[in-house]
Amino acid sequence: MKILYPGTFDPLTNGHLDLIQRAEKLFGNVVVAVLENTSKKPTFNLNKRLVQIKNAVSHLSNISVISYEGLTVDCAKEVNANLILRGLRAMSDFEYELQIAHTNKSLNTEIETIFLSTNTNYSFLSSSLVKEVAKFGGEIDHMVPDSVERDLKNYFKKD
């Protein structure tokens, strides 16, 4: 079984990585699909985010990392995944994600959305929060993989 895990991952957090590892155990093959969202200005460009994720999952055997633009259901169909993975940190996530899941279902009835609750160790994490902490020199080693930590520290380095 193959599941698609879409997102901007700007940057990848340990919460994202935990979901990827758990999804691999549950579903076998995980395709991490990095959205090239032209309406947002990401901290890291698409290629950097792809490299960050590939480095973080290099020890896992059934993970592929791709980029996409457009509709997530089209990406899922393109990679032959009939499941889409979404992580839930709080009830507020559920309301938003359920709306997206219903929209995706209306676009392609063959694709199901699977929700996994975030590990409580990471339930406070978001990419935005990590960037905010890094910007002000806070410790982020428990929030992101090593390579992402280095990249963030370099990005926010004060001269």
UniProtKB/Swiss-Prot annotation:
Extent of the signal sequence: none
Instruction: Specify which residues bind substrate according to the UniProt entry for this protein.
Output: T8, K40, T72, R86
Keyword Transferase annotated: yes
EC no.? 2.7.7.3
Q: Where is this site: Transition state stabilizer?
A: H16
Q: Which InterPro entries match?
A: Cyt_trans-like (IPR004821), PPAT (IPR001980), Rossmann-like_a/b/a_fold (IPR014729)
Cofactors (names): Mg(2+)
Q: Name one GO cellular component term.
A: cytoplasm
Q: Catalytic activity annotated for this protein?
A: (R)-4'-phosphopantetheine + ATP + H(+) = 3'-dephospho-CoA + diphosphate
List ligand-binding residues for ATP: T8, F9, H16, G87, L88, R89, E97, Y122, S123, F124, L125, S126, S127, S128
Principal place of residence: cytoplasm
* GO terms classed as biological process: coenzyme A biosynthetic process
The Gene Ontology terms for molecular function here are: ATP binding; pantetheine-phosphate adenylyltransferase activity
Subcellular location field = Cytoplasm
State the function annotated in the UniProt record.
Answer: Reversibly transfers an adenylyl group from ATP to 4'-phosphopantetheine, yielding dephospho-CoA (dPCoA) and pyrophosphate.
| Family, similarity comment | Belongs to the bacterial CoaD family.
Query: What PANTHER family does the annotation carry?
Result: PHOSPHOPANTETHEINE ADENYLYLTRANSFERASE
Assembly, in brief, is:
Homohexamer.
Q: What is this protein called?
A: Phosphopantetheine adenylyltransferase
Taxonomic lineage from the root: Bacteria, Bacillati, Cyanobacteriota, Cyanophyceae, Synechococcales
